[in-house]
From Swiss-Prot:
Membrane topology: Multi-pass membrane protein
Gene3D superfamilies for this protein: 1.10.3730.20
HAMAP family registered for this protein in UniProt: MdtI (MF_01597)
Organism: Yersinia pestis
Example GO BP: choline transport
Annotated function: Catalyzes the excretion of spermidine.
Assembly, per entry: Forms a complex with MdtJ.
Name of the protein: Spermidine export protein MdtI
Keyword Cell inner membrane on entry: yes
SUPFAM superfamilies registered for this protein in UniProt: Multidrug resistance efflux transporter EmrE (SSF103481)
Length: 109
């Protein structure tokens, strides 16, 4: 199993946070009707990919991408629940549990 170092993990955390911000801003932009929020969303995505590019220098691509995507989805679900009153049905919860289980399996492999 690969030993993780601080800086790649920090960049991965930054990438996840920027992805969450991008998703929230995209929702708030109302389909780019609020152009500045849409532009900020795009800049956040660019920042997230840039941070992910730095993270994969010290973390295997498959692990970094799975963690980035998985944590991003899980946190975006939580943000949608808190900020926009969006709720998952039982199929959504099953999917989220499978996603988290898959992330654990990839990390353990």
């Amino acid at each position: 199993m690969q030993q993780l170092e601080f800086y790649p993990i920090a960049f991965l955390i930054l990438a996840v946070m920027l992805e969450i911000v991008a998703n929230i801003l995209l929702k708030m932009s109302d389909g780019f009707r609020r152009k500045w929020l849409g532009i900020l969303s795009l800049l956040s995505v660019l920042g997230a990919f840039s941070a992910l590019a730095q993270a994969v220098k010290g973390i295997e691509l498959s692990v970094a991408y799975a963690l980035w995507g998985g944590f991003g989805i899980a946190a975006t679900v939580a943000a949608g629940w808190i900020l926009f009153n969006q709720r998952l049905n039982y199929k959504g919860w099953i999917g989220l549990i499978l996603l988290l289980a898959g992330m654990v399996m990839i990390k353990l492999s």
